[in-house]
Amino acid sequence: MNVNFTPRAWYEYTGWQLEDKKTLKRINAMIKDIERNGNTGIGKPEPLRSDLSGYWSRRIDDENRLVYKLIGEGEARELVIFKCTTHYE
């Protein structure tokens, strides 16, 4: 599975690398879990609604969320990370 970040999500992800290694480890664990289990697993995955229909969210901690979308099936499946900080905007 390919893992891609939007420019904003990559900026947020690299910010965690500098600011909080514990949170970064949690994000990395979630990404691995998504690769293995899809839309089930750690972080209380939930589908988003309205404008964000088709996206999923997982709780990094009380304040921050990992927002992502799985595209495709099988070997061609792609994980796109849209956000890895505070609630949806």
Question: Which residue ranges define each predicted feature?
Answer:
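Enriched for short, Lys/Arg-rich terminal
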Residues: 2, 11, 15-24, 58-65, ...
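PIN/NYN-family metal-dependent endoribonuclease catalytic core
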Residues: 5-6
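A short, hydrophobic secondary-structure junction motif
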Residues: 31, 37, 85-89
